[in-house]
Amino acid sequence: MTAVQSSIALGFFDGVHTAHRTIIETAVRKAEMRGLRPVVLTFDKAPSEVLFGSAPPYITTLEEKERLINALGAQMCLMHTSRSLLSMTAEEFAEKILVQKYNAAEVTCGFNYRFGSAGSGDTQLLTKLGKRFGFNVTVVGERISGGETVSSSRIRTLISSGRIEEANILLGRSFSISGTVEHGKRLGRTIGFPTANVYPQSGALLPMSGVYETVVEINGERLSAITNTGTNPTVGKETLRMETYIPSAEVDLYGKRITVEFVRFIRPEKKFSDLEALKRQIREDLNGIAAFNNKKI
């Protein structure tokens, strides 16, 4: 057992969206009030991935999740998602993990939190176990936006259907994908639009195929950009990829790590008759972005 008592936020927190933030911020606030260690206790992978061999695509990688949690003032503590852990009863989880391992004094979770083997424990049972083992339990109610509950599954649906602006409202920030720029076929360079090619991490959520207004962060600098996600039908390439053209960047980005923030869906991916038609469309897309943003100002 750790000597310092903890204020623990419980959940998987994929996306660290606005509802998640309320849970984490509540745990951090309780930690500050009582001089506790603020902890976000979560799994390293979705339980369904271990139990059934598949899971919904991840909105955030573990690295991104940890960065977002740290920014809220908490420390992310990972539980290795194993069958032995998932087979624990709710009572065993409370006693062995929350109390004996993390010395819980305060526990915060969402209204629909489940724990223990086959999700046998709910918030009512957690509250009872808190009284038995000596920790307080705070249950955060659901967060509603647009008449619906804010949830990771809802955000995944929005992103995968290209409704980026709606997803970003629920996330409380722009949906983003980070990766190292790799060499592609250099087609963009030959037509005057060199692109930074990033191949997202396996299991990561990708937006619907199409063209998006984006912002790229490189070494702390944020630059306006345009990103195409999909299979590049004009040149017959079937591998899923993400190509970003940054008008103001003339430096070589190969090997550099960048973050692409998705701002707005522009149009679906389509096949052009030739490369000249593709060039004309890219210019139209860029002009459309400029006109849209000038109108907003």
Where are the language model's segments positioned?
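A short acidic, often aromatic-flanked loop/helix-cap motif at beta-alpha or helix-coil junctions
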Residues: 1, 84-87, 144-148
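N-terminal catalytic cores of NTP/NDP-binding nucleotidyl/phosphoryl-transfer enzymes
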Residues: 2-61
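Residue-level signal for inorganic ion chemistry
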Residues: 17, 69, 107, 167, ...
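N-terminal Rossmann-like or analogous alpha/beta NTP/dinucleotide-binding catalytic cores
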Residues: 49-111, 115-133
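Glycine-rich, Lys/Arg-enriched anion-binding loops that position phosphate/diphosphate groups
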Residues: 130-230
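Phosphate/ribose-recognition catalytic cores of enzymes acting on nucleotide-derived substrates
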Residues: 184-297
